[in-house]
């Protein structure tokens, strides 16, 4: 195994300019889509990794605070290669939409770094940054009963779930150490001592230059936006939709497009 790892490192990783790792969660985990970017590396490598993460259509991006524990972290910290890890899909299942989203994310990243001349998505994504992530593990063997779902917002000391024994006795209560958003948690009933239970991160409250760009964008559009929307509502396409919708309404019903 060590020889295989060495061969992959020398023949592939060290010859790469960028590193994109695609993950789908373990069979026993449910998660909300998010992306990691390398955070323990030279400043220019961290910044390049972050810019890659900003191309991904997910709600959250997590700045990794370790240099090991993943090939993408090794690539950035040891080989000076900007790196990200995408998490989408979970519990050993997949959907066509998830596959298409992952392909679109990879294409957008490749376009952003100049490695692909294809058509990038016209959308601009704004994943919220997290750099304080808590990985809570079980202190006992038992059965896990969560009360939250991935993507839920939690507050410090909030009850997240409990671990019981086979007789139903509560052996451990899990509470949030801080405010945050649940990224993933164990979806299986059984958990083992020292094994993962739930993970959540705190959204960074920092000045984000992207917010300024958003405000400027909508400021430029504000003067003509209402006029444009009204024109669209009175277009030929809107008229065809009205005709189709009226076919399915009661005869006495009234229907109009609000504007």
Tell what function each PLM region has.
Residues 1-259:
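Structured catalytic-domain cores with a bias toward divalent-metal coordination
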